[in-house]
């Protein structure tokens, strides 16, 4: 395995981590106006992700930075061609951060309701658009001989791209519902579990159709296995949610996301951005990678700092592992409403 291939695999792992961790953040934000019946419950839902949401976004920054450094041609074509959807995603992520900071600053139901709506919007847009973007990358986009994207926004809003967006939206919502059930107690936890079962009834057929179409059009024997495993994991998560086994259900949805990313990246190989204009114009791992020396330096940096980051993030999740119960008190500091877990059992 050469270094370019190593970094292609590592970028796939980074996206997997981002979708697993930020996926339940998006899901909680999407469900906030519907699952939380009053301000106390909505505050409790926000508190489940309060200590970790910003750390989860580090995976996105790392994936983007790794793409820029290891595959500069891929980064240039991707971010110039997809600039509008990526700009919308960036704006939505900024809105989410502002919501966490400002929601509890004013004692006004109207103020908080408006920020809850903004948090919903800032969660649903990335959840939808990430699926649209990755589906189009696998499908192939119009790229000319100079590796310049020649399409427009409507080019990306094809039926396959929109189906991919609906799949990620459904999976992240399901992931967030199960996470809420896992991290809370009482009626809120039970309501989240029931919601997860209902969302799964939409997520399972959507994911099945998307994976089937993907494998029929772009698949290969190895990714047939990962696609089938993703479907099994999703069905297993649904069964676990029905039986009230939130831990197993969360593991199932996490595995579904990891295996789905593995399927998409496996189908991409050896391309990183296929051209629908001509296969000769496609960006590949070989022609889009950085110089060998750059990849060597990056590999040593990753070897040193990746374990440190993983250890810190693992410690964060361990510290805030307890379930949250009841309306949480107001936060005395800036940031999400409460940054300390409140009572409850592990």
Outline where the language-model segments fall.
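N-terminal signal-anchor module of multipass membrane proteins
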Residues: 1-55, 61-64
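Long, contiguous internal "core" modules enriched in hydrophobic/ aromatic residues
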Residues: 102-249, 260-266
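Alpha-helical transmembrane segments of integral membrane proteins, especially early/N-terminal helices
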Residues: 13-16, 20, 44-58, 81-91, ...
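Juxtamembrane membrane-water interface segments of multi-pass membrane proteins
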Residues: 28-51, 68-74, 101-113, 174-194, ...
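Hydrophobic alpha-helical transmembrane segments
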Residues: 156-171, 291-309
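Membrane-interface helix-loop-helix modules in multi-pass inner-membrane proteins
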Residues: 52-123, 144, 221
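Short, membrane-exposed interhelical loops at transmembrane-helix boundaries
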Residues: 275-297
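Juxtamembrane non-transmembrane "cap" segments at the membrane-aqueous interface
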Residues: 258-280
């Amino acid at each position: 395995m050469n270094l370019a291939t190593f970094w292609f695999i590592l970028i796939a792992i980074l996206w997997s981590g981002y979708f697993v961790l930020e996926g339940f953040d998006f899901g909680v934000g999407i469900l906030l106006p519907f699952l939380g019946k009053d301000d106390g419950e909505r505050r409790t839902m926000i508190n489940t992700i309060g200590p970790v949401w910003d750390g989860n976004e580090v995976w996105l920054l790392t994936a983007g930075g790794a793409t820029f450094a290891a595959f500069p041609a891929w980064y240039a074509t991707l971010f110039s061609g997809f600039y509008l959807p990526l700009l919308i995603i960036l704006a939505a992520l900024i809105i989410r951060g502002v919501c966490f900071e400002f929601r509890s600053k004013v004692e006004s139901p109207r103020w908080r309701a408006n920020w809850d709506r903004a948090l919903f919007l800032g969660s649903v847009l990335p959840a939808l658009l990430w699926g649209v973007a990755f589906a189009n990358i696998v499908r192939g986009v119009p790229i000319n001989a100079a590796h310049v994207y020649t399409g427009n926004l409507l080019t990306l809003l094809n039926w396959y791209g929109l189906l991919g967006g609906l799949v990620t939206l459904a999976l992240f919502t399901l992931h967030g519902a199960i996470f809420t059930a896992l991290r809370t107690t009482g009626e809120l936890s039970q309501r989240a579990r029931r919601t997860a079962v209902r969302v799964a009834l939409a997520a399972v057929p959507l994911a099945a159709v998307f994976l089937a179409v993907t494998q029929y059009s772009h698949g290969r024997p190895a990714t047939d296995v990962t696609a089938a495993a993703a479907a099994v994991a999703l069905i297993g998560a649904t069964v676990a949610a029905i039986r009230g086994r939130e831990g197993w259900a969360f593991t199932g949805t996490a595995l579904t996301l990891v295996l789905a990313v593995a399927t998409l990246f496996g189908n991409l190989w050896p391309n990183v951005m296929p051209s629908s204009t001509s296969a000769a114009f496609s960006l590949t791992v070989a022609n889009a990678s950085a110089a060998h020396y750059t990849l060597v330096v990056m590999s040593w940096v990753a070897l040193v700092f990746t374990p440190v980051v993983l250890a810190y993030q693992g410690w964060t999740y361990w510290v805030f592992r307890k379930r949250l119960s009841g309306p949480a008190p107001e936060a005395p500091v800036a940031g999400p409403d409460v940054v300390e877990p409140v009572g409850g059992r592990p």
